[in-house]
């Protein structure tokens, strides 16, 4: 575990940059004007999973695409499924925001942006945790699957 924690410490700036890049995508699923942004968020997620050595693909749905990724290189071990969503709610009313909703801002040690907690932050924390484990150890103690919609 020490190697994983050291890896996380060494990569904090990159993790923040990746998080902020995802937060800048205005993937508002309830607004048809943002359909392309939802696709962009799905493609961003697929690319991230692939960069970790996972097999990933986008599945088309009647609504917005979902992303499925897997790392199945731990034969005989359990499989962990992580679920999350890249879409966000509309940021209205805009006048209640202290900073632009799709421009991440750090105040008092917290990140403020639409989706920072629900749910881009949550699912990306899982993704980056798995990435840290894989990069620090070369493998994982379980098979891993992600379903992000």
Locations of the language-model features?
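Histidine/acidic-residue-rich, glycine-tolerant segments that coordinate divalent metal ions
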Residues: 141-149
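Acidic/His- and Gly-rich active-site-bordering loop/insert found
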Residues: 2-116, 123, 133-142
């Amino acid at each position: 575990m020490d190697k994983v924690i050291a890896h996380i410490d060494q990569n904090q700036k990159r993790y923040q940059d990746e998080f902020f890049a995802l937060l800048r995508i205005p993937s508002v699923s309830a607004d048809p004007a943002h359909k392309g942004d939802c696709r962009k968020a799905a493609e961003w997620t697929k690319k991230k999973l692939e960069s970790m050595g996972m097999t990933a693909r986008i599945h088309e749905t009647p609504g917005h695409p979902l992303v499925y990724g897997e790392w199945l290189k731990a034969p005989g071990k359990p499989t962990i499924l992580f679920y999350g969503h890249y879409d966000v709610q509309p940021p209205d009313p805009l006048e209640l925001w202290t900073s632009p909703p799709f421009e991440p801002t750090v105040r008092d040690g917290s990140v403020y942006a639409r989706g920072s907690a629900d749910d881009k932050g949550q699912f990306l924390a899982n993704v980056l945790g798995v990435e840290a484990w894989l990069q620090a150890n070369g493998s994982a103690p379980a098979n891993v699957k992600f379903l992000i919609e």
